[in-house]
Regions:
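Extracellular/periplasmic solute-recognition and catalytic clefts
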Residues: 1-34, 57-58, 171
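Short, well-ordered beta-strand elements
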Residues: 114-124, 147-149
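Ligand-binding "clamshell"
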Residues: 3-18, 162-165, 178-193, 251-257
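Long beta-strand-rich cores associated with HINT superfamily self-processing modules
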Residues: 248-275
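Extracytoplasmic/peripheral linker and loop segments enriched in polar/acidic and small residues
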Residues: 41, 69, 89-96, 145-156, ...
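Ligand-site clamp/hinge motif
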Residues: 1-6, 10, 44, 133-136, ...
Length: 275
């Protein structure tokens, strides 16, 4: 946002800005094979502690993170309506009640006050490091003591792939609004090695196949919602922090350009220069 404002201020009426939802997001990835994160109560407590709605307001002022959403892009054709989204663990608007529940789950799971764990993150200033700082603060609100470990991309990815982490900050960036593309990240790790959360869930794998083969749109949406509830809430395997927002400043003489949700597939068919 600040860079957008600088461009507009410098170029004045010679520039214009287009914004759009983005098929990218930040994911919180607990290591489902490492104690105590092998206990779904602990994983659920971590997501309950995150104030996504407050974080959206704050982080959208300093980063391109912003929209709150589930497994499908907010604003997209398969997006979960807010009334349904807020029923998922960690996506409700009453953060005080959510954190009270998070503390209860941690106590029930035997996690002591001040429990220390590492949060491994990518050494990229935007948006990974602000996301990590925010998450560390959120988890401290429920009595945990996370340590933010920032790594170069090579060691960071090697640790995620090897399971050498407690909690990781991951991401997805896709090219098309379709459940076949967005949901594959969450099928069992032995079916998709890009699922770093290290779990096996044949029910999820079956739901993925079902929705992919379903021709009726409404029935497909129902299966996608069932998949989403299991991943993000019922089992809390891994979950989104926030989705990203595309901000594209360009010269006004660039005509016919329409910003879309993917930076991989731009629609340039009708682009032309007015001078």
């Amino acid at each position: 946002p600040a860079q957008r404002d600088e461009v507009v201020q410098f170029l004045g009426d010679r520039a214009t800005v287009q914004e759009s939802g983005w098929l990218c997001n930040i994911l919180v990835v607990p290591n489902n094979q490492r104690k105590p994160f092998d206990d779904f109560r602990v994983r659920r407590a971590l997501t309950l502690a995150i104030d996504r709605w407050g974080g959206s307001r704050a982080l959208s002022q300093i980063t391109f993170m912003g929209p709150v959403g589930g497994v499908m892009r907010p604003g997209g054709p398969f997006a979960t309506p807010e009334a349904e989204l807020t029923k998922l663990a960690g996506f409700g608007r009453d953060i005080n009640a959510a954190r009270q529940e998070a503390r209860r789950l941690l106590r029930e799971a035997g996690v002591p006050e001040g429990f220390e764990f590492t949060v491994k993150n990518r050494n990229i200033p935007m948006p990974y490091i602000p996301a990590g700082i925010f998450l560390v603060d959120q988890w401290r609100q429920v009595g945990l003591n996370p340590r933010h470990v920032i790594q170069e991309t090579g060691p960071y990815l090697a640790d995620l792939r090897a399971g050498n982490y407690d909690v990781g900050i991951d991401f997805t960036c896709d090219f098309f609004d379709d459940p076949d593309v967005q949901l594959v990240k969450f099928v069992s790790s032995d079916r998709n090695p890009l699922n770093y959360a290290r779990y096996t869930d044949r029910l999820l794998d079956g739901l993925f196949r079902q929705q992919s083969r379903e021709r009726d749109l409404q029935r497909r949406l129902q299966i996608v919602r069932q998949f989403e509830r299991r991943v993000l809430s019922d089992r809390a395997y891994q979950y989104h922090l926030l989705w990203w927002q595309r901000i594209v400043p360009h010269w006004k003489k660039l005509q016919g350009y329409r910003v879309g949700p993917s930076h991989y597939l731009e629609d340039l068919e009708e682009v032309w220069l007015s001078e």
